[in-house]
Amino acid sequence: MKKGILGRKHGMTQIFDEKGEVIPVTVIEAGPCVVVQKKTVETDGYNAIQVGFGDVKEKRLTKPLIGHFKKAGVPFKRYLREFRLDDISGYEVGSEIKVDIFKPGDRVNVTGISKGKGFAGVVKRYGANRGPMSHGSKYHRRVGSMSATTDPGRTFKGKIMPGHMGHERVTIQNLEVVKVDPELNLLLVKGSVPGPKGSLLIIKDSVKSK
């Protein structure tokens, strides 16, 4: 990984390219982020930078976090995330990371927390086949067979079952950057990204773009 930034999802819209074709895009408020800490191989065993995003009041933070920000001499930030980079020599504590690190045509991976759907059955959660819907059937949208009887005498790990759906960390890979607006700190990527409006997103350069 060579570059990354934190952002906030604003929603989806559509724009037109030079040929007049419609492109569905997600609008992301990306940055500005501030470098709060640098980690090196000598002190931490790996190279990384810790960045903060989104202003927050001091009363919303714990005392350890308040001390962490004051030691770095940077404003209080709501979100703290770490990026492992190959080379961190170009970053200093207190420096800003802005959306202009990306340009149209770049490929990025976008990570977020998907929308929570609550408790769901296997049909909605995994797309399982239904049972017979006719009269006399005792299962329509139930799990069906979960295991054998005496042997093995248990249900194997990984068997699809009803449970909590959504609210998981999801990464969409290799999305194309369509437009960058440095003045408004906006990043437009082609397609959809995880999470509801206003949720935190982690944008990194794609490793599969080559």
Curated annotation (Swiss-Prot):
This is Large ribosomal subunit protein uL3. Part of the 50S ribosomal subunit. Forms a cluster with proteins L14 and L19. PROSITE patterns: RIBOSOMAL_L3 (PS00474). GO terms for biological process: translation. One of the primary rRNA binding proteins, it binds directly near the 3'-end of the 23S rRNA, where it nucleates assembly of the 50S subunit. GO terms for cellular component: cytosolic large ribosomal subunit. Keywords: Ribonucleoprotein, Ribosomal protein, RNA-binding, rRNA-binding. SUPFAM superfamilies: Translation proteins (SSF50447). It comes from Thermoanaerobacter sp. (strain X514). The gene is rplC. The keyword Nucleus does not apply. PANTHER family: 50S RIBOSOMAL PROTEIN L3 (PTHR11229), LARGE RIBOSOMAL SUBUNIT PROTEIN UL3C (PTHR11229:SF16). One of its GO terms (molecular function) is structural constituent of ribosome. Belongs to the universal ribosomal protein uL3 family. InterPro entries: Ribosomal_uL3 (IPR000597), Ribosomal_uL3_bac/org-type (IPR019927), Ribosomal_uL3_CS (IPR019926), Transl_B-barrel_sf (IPR009000). Residues 131-155 are annotated as: Disordered. The lineage of its organism: Bacteria, Bacillati, Bacillota, Clostridia, Thermoanaerobacterales.
